[in-house]
């Protein structure tokens, strides 16, 4: 079925409606409900998250080293990608959309609805690092570890901002950018970001850019797919970069993961997700790639099979 047919548009609208309906239901379920960080016996509650959004790996954590932001659940949680067991959680927060682990072990998260960047200490203390504007979404730790960069997931704000972790003044790195979503730094020091936002749903126009955060200059990387007729992604939602420079980008609707060579733009299909929608990407230090979902507690794990292919498994986080 070619891109742009009436049947394809109808399918996209149906999936989008299902995702929105699921999100509304999720909000209703968790309204006024905060899961405690620990139970009276000291154990961590295994209540499943409402959704798994932005993710980050914690290099020092034991018993589960992946942090995830749960936007609708207003929490951050750390889990084991092999078993799904939740090892740590901090609830009662804002609309947490994305998260990174700071060099001191604290968590830095974006709060889309509140328009803030917050720091969550491991003892549960929360402080506002910066007020940047509603719609703030993706976050990435600069390679030097002294600041984070944040972008916006709406058409109302086209900036990329640098937020120092020492509380210094926020700087505008670039403006005039397309709608950004989950992004990550590559080994070349550039920030790779998906573009197009939700508006790319019907036209499959989601793409990829690289940003030089030192100068603010951007490069559009034209994607070249093996699939006939495909020129872009239906809602490009997340990016992370492997140590060899391969850029992994997720399509949110009809969710799929692609491996992109930034030098050529060639986008090879890694695999598809069985979930209704994807949200973000995380490349683990062991070579596996995680694909989170907009709603629900499942994370899709793609593991190298040793022959250039991938093995797909699904881990349910919590219970």
Task: Say what each PLM segment does.
Residues 39-47, 85-90, 124-130, 169-175, ...:
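A short beta-strand motif characteristic of beta-propeller blades
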Residues 71-72, 112-113, 153-158, 199-206, ...:
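Short, solvent-exposed loop/turn segments at conserved positions within beta-propeller repeat blades
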Residues 45-64, 92-104, 132-159, 176-200, ...:
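Beta-rich, blade/repeat-based domains predominating
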Residues 75-77, 115-119, 158-162, 206-210, ...:
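A short loop-to-beta-strand structural motif that recurs across blades of beta-propeller domains
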Residues 68-69, 109-110, 149-150, 193, ...:
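Conserved beta-strand element within WD40/beta-propeller blades
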Residues 280-319:
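Blade-level signature of beta-propeller repeat domains, shared across WD40, Kelch, NHL, RCC1
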Residues 5-38:
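Secretory targeting and sorting signals
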Residues 80-84, 120-125, 163-168, 212-216, ...:
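Short loop/turn segments that connect beta-strands within beta-propeller blades
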């Amino acid at each position: 079925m070619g891109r742009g047919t009436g049947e394809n548009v109808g399918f996209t609208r149906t999936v989008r409606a299902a995702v929105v309906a699921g999100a509304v239901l999720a909000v209703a379920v968790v309204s006024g409900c905060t899961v405690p960080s620990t139970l009276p016996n000291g154990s961590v509650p295994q209540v499943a998250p409402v959704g798994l959004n932005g993710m980050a790996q914690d290099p020092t954590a034991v018993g589960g080293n992946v942090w995830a932001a749960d936007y609708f659940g207003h929490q951050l949680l750390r889990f084991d990608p092999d078993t799904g067991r939740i090892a740590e959680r901090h609830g009662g927060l804002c609309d947490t959309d994305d998260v990174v682990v700071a060099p001191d072990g604290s968590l830095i998260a974006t709060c889309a609805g509140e328009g803030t960047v917050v720091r969550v200490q491991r003892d549960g203390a929360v402080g506002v690092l910066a007020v940047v504007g509603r719609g703030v979404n993706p976050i990435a730790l600069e390679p030097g570890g002294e600041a984070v960069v944040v972008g916006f997931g709406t058409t109302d704000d086209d900036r990329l901002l640098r937020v120092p972790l020492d509380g210094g003044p926020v700087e505008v790195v670039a403006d005039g950018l397309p709608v950004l979503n989950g992004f990550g730094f590559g080994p070349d020091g550039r920030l790779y970001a998906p573009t197009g936002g939700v508006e790319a749903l019907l036209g499959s126009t989601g793409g990829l850019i690289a940003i030089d955060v030192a100068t603010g200059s951007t490069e559009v990387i034209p994607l070249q797919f093996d699939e006939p007729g495909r020129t872009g992604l239906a809602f490009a939602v997340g990016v992370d970069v492997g140590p060899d420079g391969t850029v992994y980008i997720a399509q949110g609707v009809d969710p799929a993961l692609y491996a992109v060579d930034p030098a050529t733009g060639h986008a090879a299909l890694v695999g598809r997700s069985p979930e209704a929608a994807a949200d973000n990407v995380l490349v683990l230090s062991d070579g596996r790639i995680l694909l989170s979902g907009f709603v629900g507690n499942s994370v899709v794990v793609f593991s190298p099979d040793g022959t250039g292919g991938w093995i797909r498994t699904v881990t349910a986080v919590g219970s």
